Amino acid sequence: MSIEEKIQLIEKGTLEVIDTEELKEVLKKEQPIAYTGYEPSGKIHLGHAVTVQKLKTLQKLGFKIKILLADFHAFLNGKGSIEEIAETAEYNMKCFKALGLDETTEFILGSSFQLNEDYASKVYKLATLTTLKRARRSMDQVSRHDENPKVASVVYPIMQTVDMVALDVDVALGGMEQRKIQMLARENLEKIDEKVPVCIHTPLLHGLDGDAKMSSSKGNYIAVDDSVEEITKKIKKSYCPQGETEGNPMIEIAETFVYPNQETLLIKRPEKFGGDIELTHEQLINDFSNGDLHPMDLKNGIKDFLIEHFAPVREYMEE
């Protein structure tokens, strides 16, 4: 596979790659390193699965995958005690394995290296180069809204920057909520003569309630290990306004998970409502926009797909 073909695969389903010319150079390496960091703070849901899909693509293209289980970051972001976060990290790691990342994937706890002398030295150095305003702005979409923010909220993005050095990262992957932090990292790492990673950003899924972001803290998610009953209940109650495709979580799930994996979505219906249909992406958008596909029929199709698609995850988690 040529470098151009690899880039096309990497760009598919992403919002941006910063930047493509740098990525070309990275792809010339024998085994470049790609990483994503996750706060161990709750259930692993479809929002996480978006980035895991891309990690699996990178893995197939020869990347070494490192997943940072950012326990100290979760603590700084008020997600629980160190003990609670450690327990969640174990569960999260099992979920990521269940999603199909292979045995070469390296899982790393932030606390395993973030107290090292060299790491701390770089954090202090970057703290002298980063304005308070810039650090706080980078956290806009990552931390909870707080009218009286803690100092921890500005230490967080500086640590995330140094993580990229400590893990020897060539590619940093994250959802769009990570963009401001990653742009800060690119600027600051250049200032201290460290390797600047390529940054890849994936789209955020709307919550099942129509909120701008699917989040475990808001409860508006489908967990990758949800039971058949839980998936059915959550999809039935989900936001799916008739005729609207923008910001519709059912359409987003179809675009993010169904069509990258199969050509059509099967929607089972009683004969009196037209019988079963299989829709391509284009047909789905047209039929739903025109009112020819009822929201409940779309929900049922998405529900059936998710139940089948994540069956291996449920089985793995039950072992």
Curated annotation (Swiss-Prot):
Keywords in alphabetical order: Aminoacyl-tRNA synthetase, ATP-binding, Cytoplasm, Ligase, Nucleotide-binding, Protein biosynthesis
Keyword Manganese carried by entry: no
Domain of life, source organism: Archaea
Catalytic reaction list: tRNA(Tyr) + L-tyrosine + ATP = L-tyrosyl-tRNA(Tyr) + AMP + diphosphate + H(+)
Motif 'HIGH' region: where in chain: 40-48
Chain residues that bind ATP: S216
Any one GO cellular component localisation term in the record: cytoplasm
GO molecular function, one term: ATP binding
SUPFAM superfamilies given in the database record: Nucleotidylyl transferase
EC number: 6.1.1.1
Short motif ('KMSKS' region): ranges: 213-217
Binding site for L-tyrosine: Y35, Y156, Q160, D163, Q178
Cell compartment(s), UniProt: Cytoplasm
EC class name: ligase
Nucleotide-binding listed as a keyword: yes
Any one of the GO BP annotations: tyrosyl-tRNA aminoacylation
Family: Belongs to the class-I aminoacyl-tRNA synthetase family. TyrS type 3 subfamily.
HAMAP family registered for this protein in UniProt: Tyr_tRNA_synth_type3
Biological function: Catalyzes the attachment of tyrosine to tRNA(Tyr) in a two-step reaction: tyrosine is first activated by ATP to form Tyr-AMP and then transferred to the acceptor end of tRNA(Tyr).
Subunit details: Homodimer.
Identification of the protein by name: Tyrosine--tRNA ligase
Organism: Methanobrevibacter smithii (strain ATCC 35061 / DSM 861 / OCM 144 / PS)
Source species taxonomy: Archaea, Methanobacteriati, Methanobacteriota, Methanomada group, Methanobacteria
Gene name of the encoded protein: tyrS
